[in-house]
């Protein structure tokens, strides 16, 4: 009897072990498959361009996003009309729109972006920064423009939140005036072009300034330097937080798609103004200021897209040599002209990529994007200024209207100081390339930039539209520039 009970217990144990073993055999392949998929996902992370190309993340929530965007659009178009309640999501969006507005002016070198940025700098409701990413490019030279795009985006995120501590990472160890006397904190003197910043060069940061912040007019850099002692960046951060609109202008971001994570951030409330200019006029202006743009052009040429083609050229001239290698001085013309021309090819490719990118963008993103041509801005400064202010949520000012008009009706093109902002002759600025570029130079630019030129409605030299343009003395306005655009 006892033997029978013992055998029964052993049989039950054996059955239980067999069941557990079978279950384990079933679970092991599933666990292994799950682990391999995770490893594969970690090794094969989709790139930004592939992730954004079909806008799949937006499509998943298209209905609710588009509905909220429509409500916001209707409210902006008719302030007296109360939008229909849309639940918690609508409340979140409403709170975001009441927060700060952030604007990024997306441009490239010699497109007139300093003038466009100055319109924001003059507005009393705007806190404006001029090319803060200059510090990053200088600190990491000779770098790769493409590989620096992520760092530029992260810097933008911090600066838009009025956190300037990121600038310490790229500060040059030099002038003691750039540091506060009581600490290691940086001061406003380290900022690129700080002497023309309206916030830095007016009260309360500069009590002795001759102009109030609300007065519209260019800041004299020498006068600001003599009357406005540097203040810690913490004080500038405090001023930044007071303004309803923060605008940053820069020329070193080559891919609009890099900004999509910031545009998606509901707490950032970011919009982008992208400025274009006739590539032939850009090339003419770049040649005039070739020595000031040579380092920047080399950074552009070191991108992976053209690395194989141009790396041998750069190394042959000893420019941007690999660590440990011998590096010579920057080349002089005509080799400098070659670098500038080649960099323009990369820039035109970036323009084309951005134009196609925005064409396939969802409605919510297109409403946060404004496309503007320099030629339209200087021929119709007041019309384009009102369009710009409406997009940015800023009030119109008669003094700013007059400022924009007078800045485009100067007496000269300003060739003596190409990096100095002053009133220019709009006609001369638009058409100077026709007299200063050779036929071969024009042909090279048009060959490299033709796809982008066609999308931006710039006629090739010699065709029927171009002949009419020369006869009338102005560039035809872009006909499809009003998709919010």
Curated annotation (Swiss-Prot):
Any one of the GO CC terms: Golgi membrane
Membrane topology: Single-pass type II membrane protein
Residues carrying Phosphoserine: 461
Top-level enzyme category: transferase
Compositionally biased residues, Basic and acidic residues: 465-475
Pfam hit, one: Sulfotransfer_1
GO-annotated biological processes: carbohydrate metabolic process; chondroitin sulfate proteoglycan biosynthetic process; N-acetylglucosamine metabolic process; sulfur compound metabolic process
Keyword presence, Phosphoprotein: yes
Residues annotated as transmembrane: 13-33
Residues that coordinate or bind 3'-phosphoadenylyl sulfate: 109-115, 277-285
Segments on the Lumenal face: 34-485
InterPro entries (alphabetical): Carbohydrate_sulfotransferase (IPR016469), Gal/GlcNAc/GalNAc_ST (IPR051135), P-loop_NTPase (IPR027417), Sulfotransferase_dom (IPR000863)
Glycosylation sites: 88, 185, 406
Keyword terms: Carbohydrate metabolism, Glycoprotein, Golgi apparatus, Membrane, Phosphoprotein, Signal-anchor, Transferase, Transmembrane, Transmembrane helix
Annotated catalysed reactions: chondroitin beta-D-glucuronate + n 3'-phosphoadenylyl sulfate = chondroitin 6'-sulfate + n adenosine 3',5'-bisphosphate + n H(+)
Its biological purpose: Sulfotransferase that utilizes 3'-phospho-5'-adenylyl sulfate (PAPS) as sulfonate donor to catalyze the transfer of sulfate to position 6 of non-reducing N-acetylglucosamine (GlcNAc) residues. Preferentially acts on mannose-linked GlcNAc. Also able to catalyze the transfer of sulfate to position 6 of the N-acetylgalactosamine (GalNAc) residue of chondroitin. Also acts on core 2 mucin-type oligosaccharide and N-acetyllactosamine oligomer with a lower efficiency. Has weak or no activity toward keratan sulfate and oligosaccharides containing the Galbeta1-4GlcNAc.
Similarity-based family: Belongs to the sulfotransferase 1 family. Gal/GlcNAc/GalNAc subfamily.
UniProt-listed PANTHER family: CARBOHYDRATE SULFOTRANSFERASE, CARBOHYDRATE SULFOTRANSFERASE 7
Protein name, entry field: Carbohydrate sulfotransferase 7
UniProt source species: Rattus norvegicus (Rat)
Gene that produces this protein: Chst7
């Amino acid at each position: 009897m006892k033997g029978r009970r013992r055998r029964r217990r052993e049989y039950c144990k054996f059955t239980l072990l067999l069941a557990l073993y079978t279950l384990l055999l079933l679970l092991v392949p599933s666990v292994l498959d799950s682990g391999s998929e995770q490893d594969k996902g970690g090794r094969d992370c989709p790139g930004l361009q592939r992730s954004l190309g079909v806008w799949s993340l937006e499509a998943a929530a298209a209905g609710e996003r588009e509905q909220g965007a429509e409500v916001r659009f209707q409210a902006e178009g008719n302030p007296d009309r109360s939008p229909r309640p849309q639940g918690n999501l609508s409340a979140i969006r409403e709170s975001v729109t009441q927060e700060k507005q952030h604007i990024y002016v997306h441009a490239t070198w010699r497109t007139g972006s300093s003038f466009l940025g100055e319109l924001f700098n003059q507005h009393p409701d705007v806190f404006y920064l001029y090319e803060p990413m200059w510090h990053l490019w200088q600190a990491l030279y000779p770098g790769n423009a493409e590989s620096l795009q992520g760092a530029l985006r992260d810097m933008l995120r911090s600066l838009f939140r009025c956190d300037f501590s990121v600038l310490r990472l790229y500060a040059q160890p030099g002038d003691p005036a750039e540091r506060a006397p009581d600490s290691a904190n940086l001061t406003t003197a380290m900022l690129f072009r700080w002497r023309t910043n309206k916030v830095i060069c007016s009260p309360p940061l500069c009590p002795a300034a001759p102009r109030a912040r609300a007065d519209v007019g260019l800041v004299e850099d020498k006068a600001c330097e003599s009357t406005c002692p540097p203040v810690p960046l913490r004080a500038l951060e405090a001023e930044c937080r007071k303004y309803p609109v923060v605008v940053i202008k820069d020329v070193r971001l080559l891919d609009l798609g890099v900004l999509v994570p910031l545009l998606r951030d509901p707490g950032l409330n970011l919009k982008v103004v992208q400025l274009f200019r006739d590539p032939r006029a850009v090339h003419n202006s770049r040649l005039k200021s070739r020595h000031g743009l040579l380092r920047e052009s080399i950074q552009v040429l070191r991108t992976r897209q053209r690395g194989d083609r141009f790396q041998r050229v750069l190394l042959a001239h000893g420019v941007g040599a690999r660590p440990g290698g011998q590096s010579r001085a920057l080349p002089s013309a005509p080799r400098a002209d070659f670098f500038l021309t080649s960099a323009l090819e990369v820039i035109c490719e970036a323009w084309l990529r951005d134009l196609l990118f925005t064409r396939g963008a969802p409605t919510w993103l297109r409403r946060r994007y404004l496309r503007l041509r320099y030629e339209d801005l200087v021929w119709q400064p007041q019309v384009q200024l009102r369009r710009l202010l409406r997009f940015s949520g800023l009030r119109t000012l008669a003094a700013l209207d007059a400022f924009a008009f007078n800045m485009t009706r100067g007496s000269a093109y300003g060739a003596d100081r190409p990096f100095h902002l002053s009133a220019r002759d709009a006609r001369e600025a638009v058409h100077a390339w026709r007299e200063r570029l050779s036929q071969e130079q024009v042909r090279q630019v048009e060959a490299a930039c033709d796809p982008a030129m066609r999308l931006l409605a710039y006629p090739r030299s010699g065709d029927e539209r171009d002949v009419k343009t020369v006869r009338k003395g102005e560039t035809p306005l872009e006909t499809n520039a009003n998709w919010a655009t």
